[in-house]
UniProtKB/Swiss-Prot annotation:
Key words of the record: Ribonucleoprotein, Ribosomal protein, RNA-binding, rRNA-binding
Lineage, top ranks: Bacteria, Bacillati, Bacillota, Bacilli, Lactobacillales
Single GO cellular component term: large ribosomal subunit
InterPro entries: NA-bd_OB-fold, Rib_uL2_dom2, Ribosomal_uL2, Ribosomal_uL2_bac/org-type, Ribosomal_uL2_C, Ribosomal_uL2_CS, Ribosomal_uL2_dom3, Ribosomal_uL2_RNA-bd_dom
Name of the gene this protein is made from: rplB
Region (Disordered): 208-281
Record flagged with keyword rRNA-binding: yes
GO molecular function: rRNA binding; structural constituent of ribosome; transferase activity
Subunit structure: Part of the 50S ribosomal subunit. Forms a bridge to the 30S subunit in the 70S ribosome.
Gene3D superfamilies documented for this protein: 2.30.30.30, Nucleic acid-binding proteins, Ribosomal protein L2, domain 3
Protein name, per record: Large ribosomal subunit protein uL2
Family designation: Belongs to the universal ribosomal protein uL2 family.
């Protein structure tokens, strides 16, 4: 979708922009593919906060997305491109030849009226899903499985894509959008093309209220808290951290501290790590 810039009539709208929704062809979702979505405000079943800065937000319904694409050799026609409030990517409504309907992530270039298919013998074209072993080297892919039959887990957000770099017996090499090169089982499936809505990264909220609509509450800096609330708190005026390294609210090292386990089983499948910023090297 394109980006629409608003006139600066108020301070909140001065730099604000939003989607123009030019690609959206249907505004009401398919009722049979909806599920209730309860907001928990970051609390668990005991009512205790497990994730900070969450709460409120607009009510929304979950769109049931087909990440598995296991309906093989049955062609489906793209009936509509819809907005999904639960993710950054748009979704496409498919109507299969046998009468069933489903939602998929809308790849870039997918239009209403186009036909998509899944299965080992599907053509190499945008929107088709195949096992990785059947996809040519160099192809751009998205919605990649990590376990056969589990459904796509990688490369699902707006504008992202991965590339198939090579094949080895049971595994294939895939370069993810982070720059990481990873070995994935060749029996896992992926969808051809890159995710659409690639201008999402240019979105400017412009005011705090748009974060509140999304269920995001204010993120208060530790340096403006009291010493009993945060390790960075206290002091006269704008005091520095006063510690060898920044700490989390619970006293753990943060900013550049690696949190991934050195014993993780999946470490052996990472051929090359992701690109890192200067503060994490």
């Amino acid at each position: 979708m394109g980006i629409r810039k608003y006139k600066g009539t108020t301070n909140g709208r001065r730099n604000m922009n939003g989607y123009d929704f030019a690609e959206i062809t249907k505004t009401t979702p398919e009722k049979s593919l909806l599920a209730p979505l309860k907001h928990t405000a970051g609390r668990n079943n005991a009512g205790k906060m497990t994730v900070r800065h969450r709460g409120g937000g607009t009510k929304r319904q979950y769109r049931i997305i087909d990440f598995k694409r296991i309906k093989d050799d049955v062609p489906a026609t793209v009936k509509a491109i819809e907005y999904d409030p639960n993710r950054t990517a748009n979704i496409a409504l498919l109507g299969y030849a046998d009468g069933t309907k489903s939602y998929i992530l809308a790849p870039k270039g997918l239009k209403v009226g186009m036909t998509v298919q899944s299965g080992p013998d599907a053509d190499i074209k945008v929107g088709n899903t195949l096992p990785l072993k059947n996809i040519p080297v160099g192809t751009v892919i998205h919605n990649i499985e990590l376990k056969p039959g589990k459904g796509g887990q990688l490369t699902r957000s707006a504008g992202t894509s991965a590339q198939l770099l090579g094949k080895e017996e049971k595994y294939v090499l895939v370069r993810l959008s982070s720059g990481e090169v990873r070995m994935i089982l060749a029996a896992c499936r992926a969808t051809i093309g890159s995710i659409g809505n690639d201008e999402h990264g240019l979105l400017v909220k412009g005011k705090a209220g748009r974060s509140r609509y999304a269920g995001q509450r204010p993120h208060v800096r530790g340096s403006v808290m009291n010493p009993n609330d945060h390790p960075h708190g206290g002091g006269e005026g704008k005091a520095p951290v006063g510690l060898p390294s920044p700490l989390s609210p619970w006293g753990k090292k943060t900013v550049g501290k690696k949190t991934r386990s050195h014993k993780a089983r999946s470490n052996k499948f990472i051929v090359r790590g992701r690109k890192r910023g200067p503060h994490t090297r």
